[in-house]
């Protein structure tokens, strides 16, 4: 889709025209314009629109017999005109401006159409869609391989397969009733409808021939997008061929079929006339080129109308709500299996539900969770459920469960799209204050996320639309109108919904959830109501809705509960440091060393020294507390007024995050800014080349692999690093090879998708304040830790507690930035200095409290309440003049006060308004495009304007101030490096384009090869060295734990559609399908957290108390732990147990890979055993990779 060659200038070939009389035809207008202005290719004249304040009413199927009105506000006649050459559009605009365009005595108004790159116009004209007109479309369900149930049918549909934008469209016309608020009558208007899907959303295509023509059956991964616009246009074309669409908006809507066919059915049967045979063949060739899977049809399926064909459904979501004798937990999982497409609704008979009624709850939960991991449809639900239940009963080890930490909760999720909803299997997540308090009813909480079809981010264009610019000019109507999708969302928020026998009501949301378009709902019971929960949370006195909502959301921040700190131990009156209207201490307080150590103990952190700062929630306070020497006055926590957000009596200190080693990576925004500030392109190129060289050597050179793991993977690389250092080799140890391969491909993915280049002399650091007041303006203090895997063995007894505290004080110029950073002034150049009084602070960025303006505020308008900053002290990344560009002014938007207390409906309205107006992602993407296309880069005027808009958008959750994206700044073309496959792209010649193309081919080849690579389970090597005498006694217990662990891990792989376990265990995830979400980062973080919780849970199981442990010496304990680790290894790697493990993965499938990560939960003890078996002569003490072996060998 990229246009190679030079970028052609953007041109306007379209205009919108109004002011002519109602009797004017498209041909008359065309003839006049060709005489006065220039050749016209197409003229589309409109006299209809969606009446303001109305919505399509799809409950009315037959519009011929309803009372209709014609007295709604009509639109002035207007036309959309495409000229042959762009000069004609300019001439028309000029002539109208001078009142020289007069038709039938009436002066015409002209509005310029969209500005499009010349190459885009040309490509649209030369890329011909494969149009199969007059087809019959049947939307239904492939109930079995031989039966197709039709839910909805339409004739005279046009089917377009369009390589221009890689879409398929079903287009047809339909009379539609529009309803008005508080009105009985309806307006009846003809509308054009469009069902649009991306070619990549077609899972399979089947094709066969009948006596009447050809048939395609398209199996979709998700529902198509539904659009409409008013029809009966008078169209006059003077040339054949396709043109770019004009300004007349297509409006998103919901499922218009009364039977809910678009939402619940993903099989589309297309009946095509024999005269389109050649076009059909070409379209199928295009599908093959796009790698759509083609399935052979041995014989055509039987076609029948579904039971209850044509009967309206009132269900918002297409769920099976309640069955007598079946609990909510089971019904939710049944719907999860149904929504995943494993079973279809016609298979869920009473026989199926009787199977569930006749088995214990734990068997049913395990069975349905297992079925949720299936990737393909199953056509006999009863038979498969029975098979899985029997298999689980034969293997009771799959049923056990471990008590979860109080910081972990099992969360149910519901995803709501414009046409349907999806129940997602419960996920283990970090808990929050509310869930911990209401633990007894925790399963009545539901996380609801609003998304577009294909699990894409729902954006403002789905929820609202503007009329065409010419209509604005003619009617002075510049308002945006809400779509029917918005009405659906708003009714769900306001009225709640029923699900599996429960009624759910809106509760609240955190700041992260607001960005994620999600919120908490709660199903009230007789004892606990939504109002009770909100009363317990605290007193929220803000009269600004945005601020009040944000503060309620603090109770839903994901946190660890640690120490109960009594009010008399907390100073809440510490004054803020204020100057020139700025708060230099905004969001930061202090914590005493003894309390900081207590918190670390509660968190059970695997670190050798206490974090020096924590991001916290305490009562109604939020922010960061930095470790600072105690004043011996009994005060353990000092909190400033800027940290106080609401009143609460809650006294548990809750932790969101803490300072730790976090490797530094560049990204596209930072590269764009550093480049415009004068850092040469060759610097970024050389840094990427160095990274590529190491990644290409990672599987063959243990020294390089060890360096990559310890320097760029943080704690997620520890297991693989320990294995390398102990002497395990990637060539003979498949799990180690898999982990290294995942790190390599995921980092290549980061380079391709985000230009995520590793910076050796760089970190991501939490911002803190110089409480001592020593640093001057323009200075900072940075002390960073270096990774040391020896510290992973500190629990192995006193001989191993000698920790390496390897700290480095950074000196010299540093560049800092915080995401998002769009303005050149967002990169601050500071001088890092050594201050002995601050040596107790490490892995954080200490800012001065002196100066006219806080450096935090200069950097993207940030503060000190937990923001992370990219910091680089590699002098090659410092701009040549060693100075900061003038910072943008980040003045807080004026707050709107209601003049009264904020109520529940205000919060709902605010959430809905955010959904309809969220623009930050759009603005940031537009900034990338304009910076790439302009010779001035990020200093281009349009980029500076976008930076201002982004700053306002970032603050929307706090201020409620809406930002709108100017139409002229919306990109029409995207640079190739943005990977916008579904849009028009061009080849970028700037540094980001060069970096992208350098790595793209490497990544594509490696990802494909890695997808196909698998270890033959029968060829997994077994290392007998790891057998410790007496391990046999622990095998039964080890096997039970492995069954449970593997079951949960396989569930995560299936739920997130990730291919390999090594991706999850290293946190380097690369195989998640693109259609899952545009915001893959958020999904990956959730997956990482789910796995970390799982790993922590089983590490706790591993370390569970040994009998008579109090009477055992450290060495005796270690020997017992080594036996346990040996048993865990044996049930994972021994051929006999590998075979058993594969049998447990699925009762009747044999295509799975052996799961190996369970053994390495005890990697530290397996490393001890391995190192003892090595000859000391083979350990090179000078090599970093052998440092651990030497360290342990001296102590074992």
UniProtKB/Swiss-Prot annotation:
Name of the top EC class for this enzyme: transferase
Single GO MF descriptor: DNA-directed DNA polymerase activity
Membrane spanning stretches: none
Impact noted for substituting residue 453 to K: Alters post-transcriptional gene silencing
Cellular component annotations (GO), alphabetically ordered: cytoplasmic ribonucleoprotein granule; nucleus
Gene Ontology BP terms: defense response to virus; gynoecium development; leaf development; maintenance of shoot apical meristem identity; recognition of pollen; regulatory ncRNA-mediated gene silencing; regulatory ncRNA-mediated post-transcriptional gene silencing; RNAi-mediated antiviral immune response
EC number from the UniProt entry: 2.7.7.48
Pfam families: RBD_RDR6 (PF24572), RDR6_2nd (PF24577), RdRP (PF05183)
Subunit structure, interactors included: Interacts with SGS3.
The protein's name: RNA-dependent RNA polymerase 6
Source species of the chain: Arabidopsis thaliana
Lineage, uppermost ranks: Eukaryota, Viridiplantae, Streptophyta, Embryophyta, Tracheophyta
Gene: RDR6
């Amino acid at each position: 889709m990229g246009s190679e060659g030079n970028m052609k200038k953007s041109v306007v070939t379209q205009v919108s025209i109004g002011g002519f009389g109602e009797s004017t035809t498209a041909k008359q207008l065309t003839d006049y314009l060709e005489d006065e202005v220039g050749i016209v290719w197409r003229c589309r004249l409109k006299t209809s629109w969606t009446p303001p304040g109305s919505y399509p009413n799809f409950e009315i199927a037959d519009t011929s017999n309803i009372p209709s009105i014609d007295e709604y506000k009509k639109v002035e006649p207007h036309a959309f005109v495409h000229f042959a050459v762009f000069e004609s559009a300019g001439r028309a605009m000029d002539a109208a401006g001078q009142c020289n365009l007069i038709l039938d005595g009436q002066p015409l108004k002209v509005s310029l159409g969209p500005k499009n790159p010349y190459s885009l116009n040309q490509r649209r004209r030369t890329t011909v869609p494969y149009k199969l007109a007059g087809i019959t479309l049947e939307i239904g369900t492939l109930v079995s391989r031989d039966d197709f149930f039709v839910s909805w049918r339409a004739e005279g549909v046009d089917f377009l397969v369009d390589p221009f934008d890689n879409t398929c469209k079903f287009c047809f016309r339909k009379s539609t009733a529009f309803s008005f608020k508080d009105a009985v009558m309806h307006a009846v208007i003809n509308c054009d409808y469009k069902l649009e899907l991306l070619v990549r959303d077609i899972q399979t295509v089947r094709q066969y021939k009948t006596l009447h023509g050809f048939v395609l059956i398209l199996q979709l991964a998700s529902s198509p997008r539904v659009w409409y616009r008013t029809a009966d246009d008078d169209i006059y074309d003077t040339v054949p061929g396709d043109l770019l669409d004009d300004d007349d908006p297509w409006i998103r809507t919901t499922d218009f079929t009364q039977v809910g066919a678009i939402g619940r059915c993903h099989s589309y049967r297309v009946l095509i006339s024999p005269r389109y045979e050649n076009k059909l063949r070409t379209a199928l060739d295009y599908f093959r080129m796009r790698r759509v899977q083609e399935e052979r049809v041995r014989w055509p399926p039987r076609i029948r109308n579904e039971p209850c064909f044509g009967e309206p459904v009132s269900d918002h979501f297409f769920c099976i709500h309640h069955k007598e004798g079946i609990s909510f937990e089971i019904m939710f999982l049944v719907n999860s299996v149904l929504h995943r497409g494993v079973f279809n609704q016609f298979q869920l008979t009473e026989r199926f539900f009787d199977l569930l009624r006749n088995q214990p709850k734990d068997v049913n939960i395990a069975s349905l969770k297992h079925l949720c991991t299936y990737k393909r449809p199953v056509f006999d639900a009863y038979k498969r459920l029975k098979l899985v239940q029997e298999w689980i009963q034969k293997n009771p080890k799959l049923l056990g469960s471990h008590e979860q930490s109080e910081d972990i909760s099992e969360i149910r999720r519901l995803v709501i799209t414009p046409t349907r909803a999806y129940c997602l299997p419960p996920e283990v997540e970090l808990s929050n204050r509310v869930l911990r308090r209401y633990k007894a009813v925790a399963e009545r909480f539901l996380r609801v996320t609003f998304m577009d079809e294909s699990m894409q981010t729902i954006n403002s264009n789905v929820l609202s639309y503007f009329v065409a610019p010419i209509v604005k000019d003619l009617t002075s109507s510049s308002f945006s109108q809400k779509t029917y999708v918005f009405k659906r969302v708003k009714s769900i928020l306001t009225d709640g919904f029923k699900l599996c026998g429960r009624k759910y009501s809106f509760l609240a949301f955190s700041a992260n959830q607001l960005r994620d378009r999600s919120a908490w709902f709660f199903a009230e019971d007789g004892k606990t109501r939504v109002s009770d929960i909100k009363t317990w949370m605290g007193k929220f006195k803000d009269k600004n809705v945005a601020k009040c909502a944000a503060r309620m959301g603090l109770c839903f921040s994901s946190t660890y509960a640690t120490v109960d700190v009594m009010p008399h131990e907390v100073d809440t009156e510490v004054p803020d440091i204020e100057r020139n209207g700025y708060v230099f201490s905004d969001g930061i307080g202090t914590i005493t060393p003894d309390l900081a150590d207590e918190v670390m103990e509660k968190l059970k952190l695997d670190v050798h020294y206490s974090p020096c700062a924590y991001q916290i929630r305490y009562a109604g306070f939020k922010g960061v507390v930095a470790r600072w020497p105690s004043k011996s006055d009994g005060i353990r926590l000092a909190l400033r007024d800027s940290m106080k957000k609401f009143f609460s009596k809650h006294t548990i200190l809750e932790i969101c995050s803490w300072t730790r080693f976090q490797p530094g990576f560049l990204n596209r925004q930072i590269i764009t800014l550093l480049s415009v500030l004068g850092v040469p392109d060759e610097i970024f190129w050389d840094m990427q080349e160095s990274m590529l060289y190491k990644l290409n050597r990672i599987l063959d050179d243990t020294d390089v692999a060890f360096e990559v793991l310890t320097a760029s993977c943080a704690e997620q690389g520890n297991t693989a690093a320990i294995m390398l250092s102990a002497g395990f080799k990637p060539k003979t140890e498949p799990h180690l090879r898999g982990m290294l391969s995942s790190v390599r491909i995921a980092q290549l993915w980061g380079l391709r998708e985000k230009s995520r280049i590793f910076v050796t002399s760089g970190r991501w650091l939490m911002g803190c304040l110089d409480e001592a007041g020593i640093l001057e303006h323009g200075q900072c203090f940075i002390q960073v830790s270096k990774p040391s895997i020896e510290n992973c063995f500190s629990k192995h007894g006193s001989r191993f507690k000698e920790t390496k505290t390897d700290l480095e004080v950074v000196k010299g110029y540093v560049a800092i930035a915080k995401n998002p950073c769009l303005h050149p002034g967002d990169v601050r150049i500071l001088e890092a200095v050594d201050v002995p009084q601050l040596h107790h602070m490490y892995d954080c960025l200490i800012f001065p409290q002196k100066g006219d303006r806080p450096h935090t505020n200069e950097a993207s308008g940030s503060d000190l309440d937990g923001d992370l900053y990219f910091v680089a002290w590699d002098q090659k990344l410092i701009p040549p003049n060693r100075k900061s560009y003038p910072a943008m002014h980040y003045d807080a938007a004026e707050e709107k006060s209601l003049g009264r207390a904020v109520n529940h409906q205000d919060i709902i309205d605010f959430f809905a308004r955010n959904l309809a107006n969220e623009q930050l992602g759009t603005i940031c993407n537009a900034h990338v495009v304009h910076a790439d296309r302009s010779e001035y880069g990020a200093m281009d005027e349009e980029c500076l304007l976008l930076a201002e808009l982004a700053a306002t958008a970032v603050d929307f959750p706090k201020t409620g101030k809406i930002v709108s994206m100017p139409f002229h700044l919306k990109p029409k073309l995207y640079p190739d490096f943005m990977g916008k496959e579904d849009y028009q792209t061009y080849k970028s010649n700037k540094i980001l384009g060069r970096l992208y193309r350098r790595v793209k081919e490497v990544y594509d080849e490696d990802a494909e090869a890695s997808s196909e690579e698998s270890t033959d389970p029968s060829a997994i090597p077994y290392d007998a060295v790891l057998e410790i005498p007496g391990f046999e006694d622990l095998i039964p217990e080890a096997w039970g734990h492995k069954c449970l662990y593997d079951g949960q891990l396989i569930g995560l792989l299936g739920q997130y559609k990730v291919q390999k376990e090594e991706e999850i265990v290293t946190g380097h995830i690369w195989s998640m399908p693109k259609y899952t979400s545009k915001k893959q980062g958020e999904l990956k973080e959730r997956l990482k957290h789910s796995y970390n919780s799982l790993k922590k849970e089983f590490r706790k199981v591993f370390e569970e108390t040994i009998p008579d442990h109090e009477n055992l010496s450290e060495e005796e304990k270690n020997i017992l732990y080594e036996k346990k680790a040996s048993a865990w290894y044996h049930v994972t790697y021994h051929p006999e147990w590998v075979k058993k493990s594969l049998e447990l993965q699925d009762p009747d499938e044999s295509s799975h890979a052996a799961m190996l990560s369970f053994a390495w939960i005890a990697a530290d003890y397996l490393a001890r055993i391995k190192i003892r078996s090595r000859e000391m002569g083979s350990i090179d003490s000078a090599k970093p990779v052998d440092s651990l072996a030497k360290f342990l060998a001296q102590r074992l």
